[in-house]
Amino acid sequence: MTTRLFIQDVTLRDGMHAVRHRITPDDVGKIVAALDAAGVDGIEVAHGDGLAGGSLNYGPGSNTDWEWIEAAAANLTHARLTTLLLPGIGTIAELEHAFRLGVRSVRVATHCTEADVAAQHIGKARELGMDVSGFLMMSHMTTAPELAAQAKLMESYGAHCVYVTDSGGRLTMDGVRDRVRAYRDVLDEGTEIGIHAHENLSLSVANSVVAVEEGVTRVDASLAGHGAGAGNCPIEPFIAVADLQGWKHNSALFALQDAADDLVRPLQDRPVRVDRETLTLGYAGVYSSFLRHAEAASQRYGIDVRTILLEVGRRGLVGGQEDLIVDIALDLRSRAGGN
């Protein structure tokens, strides 16, 4: 492989789910400074559900997106400051505000079958001169050809890159391979492809490696795997594998290891790992950020988290339906004869 990988860190966006969107701007600044010094190419900063994601439904943040982004911008020298926007949550006005604060790259995220709602936001980002990626979430929930058709739509709106986004950590290597190949078959040669993996089935590094072997150039990863569910692709082992494979990148392995162990792990109030709950996310194909919501419902209503997650998967809930987790817990308690 001769193409240089673009390593996109998501510790301070997807990782927000792991700490219930509670982190100080000071800690954001320290992590950004460490990532920047370690040579990552992009650093994504926002509430876990993107710009303006702080709410009762998704979970309020300890600070505003703007406070986090300002802290990041003040500690950035080389990396591309990035954010996430979900149309219907974040608005064009918020995208413009983020741009004024120094954000130069945005990932516009939709459910895997709803790319059409991203047209205006992608168009505005291009108008601002930003680097733009389309982010097709829960990519396991549709077929490879159907997903590729959605990727083609995002490309037509102006996306420079489109991601296979395994939000549920449900894809296996064949699933990743099929989707990347389907993208490559329909996307223009100049359009990049990205991979966003989760660790719920312990496959995030393997899936990311397979994606790169199939031509992916942008790889999402995070310090210590800090992210929703069992976490994202942990950046340290992925970079180690990239080194062993001889792939070109700009990241320094030891510096990333130090940042993961010294700065990120101490912030976690719940270990980010594969355990009985997070494995169930991947097994059931459930949106990884539902974990903390399901755990809260389990504690409140006395239903096993795994039982809740299996029912969430059976019903096919997608991002934005967090409020239904309580309804599911109540239904399960009623079926079990509880009051």
Swiss-Prot record:
<feature type="domain" description="Pyruvate carboxyltransferase">
    <location>
        <begin position="5"/>
        <end position="257"/>
    </location>
</feature>
<keyword id="KW-0058">Aromatic hydrocarbons catabolism</keyword>
<dbReference type="Pfam" id="PF00682">
    <property type="entry name" value="HMGL-like"/>
</dbReference>
<dbReference type="GO" id="GO:0008701">
    <property type="term" value="F:4-hydroxy-2-oxovalerate aldolase activity"/>
</dbReference>
<keyword id="KW-0456">Lyase</keyword>
<dbReference type="InterPro" id="IPR012425">
    <property type="entry name" value="DmpG_comm"/>
</dbReference>
<keyword id="KW-0464">Manganese</keyword>
<dbReference type="InterPro" id="IPR017629">
    <property type="entry name" value="4OH_2_O-val_aldolase"/>
</dbReference>
<feature type="site" description="Transition state stabilizer">
    <location>
        <position position="13"/>
    </location>
</feature>
<dbReference type="InterPro" id="IPR013785">
    <property type="entry name" value="Aldolase_TIM"/>
</dbReference>
<comment type="similarity">
    <text>Belongs to the 4-hydroxy-2-oxovalerate aldolase family.</text>
</comment>
<feature type="binding site">
    <location>
        <position position="167"/>
    </location>
    <ligand>
        <name>substrate</name>
    </ligand>
</feature>
<feature type="binding site">
    <location>
        <position position="198"/>
    </location>
    <ligand>
        <name>Mn(2+)</name>
    </ligand>
</feature>
<feature type="binding site">
    <location>
        <begin position="13"/>
        <end position="14"/>
    </location>
    <ligand>
        <name>substrate</name>
    </ligand>
</feature>
<feature type="binding site">
    <location>
        <position position="287"/>
    </location>
    <ligand>
        <name>substrate</name>
    </ligand>
</feature>
<feature type="binding site">
    <location>
        <position position="14"/>
    </location>
    <ligand>
        <name>Mn(2+)</name>
    </ligand>
</feature>
<feature type="binding site">
    <location>
        <position position="196"/>
    </location>
    <ligand>
        <name>substrate</name>
    </ligand>
</feature>
<feature type="active site" description="Proton acceptor">
    <location>
        <position position="17"/>
    </location>
</feature>
<feature type="binding site">
    <location>
        <position position="196"/>
    </location>
    <ligand>
        <name>Mn(2+)</name>
    </ligand>
</feature>
<dbReference type="GO" id="GO:0009056">
    <property type="term" value="P:catabolic process"/>
</dbReference>
<dbReference type="GO" id="GO:0003852">
    <property type="term" value="F:2-isopropylmalate synthase activity"/>
</dbReference>
<keyword id="KW-0614">Plasmid</keyword>
<dbReference type="InterPro" id="IPR050073">
    <property type="entry name" value="2-IPM_HCS-like"/>
</dbReference>
<protein>
    <recommendedName>
        <fullName>4-hydroxy-2-oxovalerate aldolase 6</fullName>
        <ecNumber>4.1.3.39</ecNumber>
    </recommendedName>
</protein>
<dbReference type="GO" id="GO:0009098">
    <property type="term" value="P:L-leucine biosynthetic process"/>
</dbReference>
<dbReference type="GO" id="GO:0030145">
    <property type="term" value="F:manganese ion binding"/>
</dbReference>
<dbReference type="InterPro" id="IPR035685">
    <property type="entry name" value="DRE_TIM_HOA"/>
</dbReference>
<keyword id="KW-0479">Metal-binding</keyword>
<dbReference type="Pfam" id="PF07836">
    <property type="entry name" value="DmpG_comm"/>
</dbReference>
<dbReference type="InterPro" id="IPR000891">
    <property type="entry name" value="PYR_CT"/>
</dbReference>
